[in-house]
Each structure stands twice: as C-alpha cells, then as structure tokens.
A protein has these predicted regions:
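Phosphate-group recognition and catalysis centered on beta-loop-alpha active-site segments
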Residues: 2-5, 10-11, 38, 45-46, ...
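Sequence-pattern detector for short linear motifs
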Residues: 14-16, 29, 34, 43, ...
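A subset of signal/propeptide-processing and intrinsically disordered low-complexity segments
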Residues: 17, 29-30, 107, 305
Length: 329
C-alpha cells in the first residue's frame, strides 16, 4: 500500500525568539479504502505553532543519516523541503509487495524484519509483520533487490534478536546503500500499548556498534479502540523518550499514530524542541478511524519540514489534495 509522509527536525523558533535546542555531541501499496468512517473531530485548544528552519544535524550526501528531504531534493525527486512530498510504500515484505514498491513512485520503502518462528538468532531474518511467522522473502534477498534502486529504506525490527541477526546482512551491502536508511523499533510502551517493547539500550548499542551513521526511528507500542476515548502520548511518555535519545548523535524520527496525535500536540511539540535532530513520522493502523481534519490540524501545528506522513487511503489522498500536493496512484 502506498502512503505518503513528511518530516525533519531543526532549530526551533517560538514567536520571534529562537530557542537553541541542545544537540549533544556524540499496510502494502497504494490502497484506497472503499468506505472508512471518519470519527467526529475532537475540538481541542490549538497549541502554539513552532516556526522552524532545517538544521544540518543529519549526515552528508550518501550517508545513512542524511536528511531525506535533502537527499530527494538533490536528486530532483521532490520540489520543496516539505515532509508531505515524501511518498511511502508501507509493508513491502513479500516478494510481490517488494516488486510493486520498487516499480512505484515511492521515495521510501518500509518493511518489517523478524526471525522465523523458532526465534533463533542464527536463523535467517525474514520480511514479515506479526502475526505472520513466515515469508517468501529473506532480508538478504530483499536487500539484494532494493540496493539496485535509489529508494530510501526503513527497516522495522520486531525484536532485539532480529536486529542482531540482521546487522551482518546490512553490513554486506552498506557500500551499495548510499542513501537514507532508517532503523526502527518500538522501545517504549505508549497509549494502549500491549505489545512487547524492544530493549532501548541494547537495540541502540547493537545498531551503533555496526552503523554509527544511521537515522533512528524510535517509537512507542500503541493501540486504538473504536468504542472508547483513546488517550494520546502523555508527558511521561515523551519525557522518557527524550531521556533515551538525549545522548545520541544520530537523527531520530518518532513514529506516532495518526489517530493519537491531535490530542498529543503539546507534548510532541515539546519533544521536537529538545533537539534539532528530532522529527515525527505519522503512521496509521489499518483499522483506525480518524478524520482527515486531524492531519490538517497536525500540518498547522508543526513545521512542514518536521513531519513525515506514512498514512493509508483515503486520508492520504484527501490530505494531499487539501494541501495542494498531487498524489500519483
């Protein structure tokens, strides 16, 4: 399924005063849902918008930590420093989905990595999303095909064991992957989260021991329930995430669930002020119900260089149409 998304973090200006953010040293294919009910918009007080300019905290040309807006602008694949211009192909796991993704107009390909059901770290990592436990595609095969393209990649690791088992495969193709590479894991419990988290320190240590120059995508486990009021990302959640990331030197994007962002804007705005390395990636669960108005609210609250949108249809099309970005189906 094809989705679209934006964002990059930067120097933050509140009103006319520039706030110096401390930087420490060191679902698959384009898919249009026939009928998706939109929840009634919640009228919340709008937090003060932060004006931001892009910072050069990411890596240089061709590095895994290069700002994706910089990379795709340089390659003339987008026209502006706007996270909403970045097109995503989500869950490009099986070979047919991977093939569709490589033929598509997507800039970034997202895929999930796990170990086969035996859980052995010596097993071959495969491309699948739970509850699946098998796949016709291994990570090694996936990388062999994707390296032939110029697309950026985001790999979502479902366990620490999967990450550890994947590092050598990534290292073997590193010289052929001179483009943005995002490494993702859910490292903290979030709103309604019930899935097991990946140990943050062990995950970060594992990845940085092989690839110190990478972009991290660090998220919260979440859930969404159609018959109850869903709380957003709380202050303790965002403060703990900042604590985990504060000693990193790499760019970090925080994947946040679209249906939970509007009620969390104050907390997430605060989080982005903590470092020029931070950004958001808005994503959607396949069964989530939320109005397109929520995406427009997010667009109004955050700077367009700080937020990427890896979202499903029909909201993706409606959102892009509303902000004047053409979507190629």
């Amino acid at each position: 399924m094809f989705t679209v998304g934006p964002a990059v973090a930067v120097r933050v200006r509140t009103s006319s005063t520039v706030a110096s953010a401390e930087v420490p040293v060191r679902s698959s294919g384009f898919r249009l849902a026939d009928n998706l009910l939109c929840a009634k918009p919640v009228h919340l007080r709008r937090p003060r918008r932060l004006s931001v300019t892009m910072a050069a905290s990411a890596g240089g040309p061709g590095s895994w930590s290069e700002n994706i807006l910089t990379y795709f602008l340089r390659n003339r694949q987008i026209t502006a420093e706007d996270g909403a211009e970045i097109l995503w192909y989500h869950a490009a796991n099986h070979k047919c989905q991977m093939s569709d993704a490589l033929k598509s107009a997507a800039h970034m390909i997202e895929a999930d990595v796990l170990l086969p059901s035996d859980g052995s770290e010596h097993g071959q990592p495969i491309m699948a999303h739970p509850p699946e436990t098998g796949s016709d595609n291994t990570l090694q095969e996936w990388l062999a095909e994707v390296t032939k393209s110029n697309k950026g990649i985001k790999l979502d690791f479902k366990s620490l064991a999967a990450a550890r088992a994947s590092m050598l495969f990534l290292d073997n193709v590193k010289q052929h992957l001179q483009r943005p590479v995002w490494i993702n894991a859910d490292v903290l419990p979030g709103p309604n989260g019930s899935s097991k988290v990946v140990d943050a320190k062990a995950f970060l240590d594992t990845v940085t021991s092989f690839f110190p120059d990478v972009t991290f995508s660090l998220g919260w486990t979440t859930g969404w329930h159609p018959e109850k009021v869903n709380e957003g990302y709380t202050w303790p959640m965002v403060k703990e995430m900042d604590y985990i990331c504060s000693e990193l030197t790499q760019p970090v994007t925080f994947p946040v669930r679209a249906a939970l962002v509007r009620q969390s804007c104050s907390q997430l705005l605060w989080l982005l002020t903590k470092s020029s390395r931070y950004s958001l990636t808005v994503w959607t669960g396949k069964d989530d119900i939320y109005p397109t108005e929520d995406l427009l609210y997010i667009r109004d609250c955050f700077n367009k260089t700080q937020v990427f949108y890896d979202i499903l249809e029909p909201q993706n099309y409606e959102f892009k149409q509303a902000i004047g970005i053409r979507v190629t189906l």
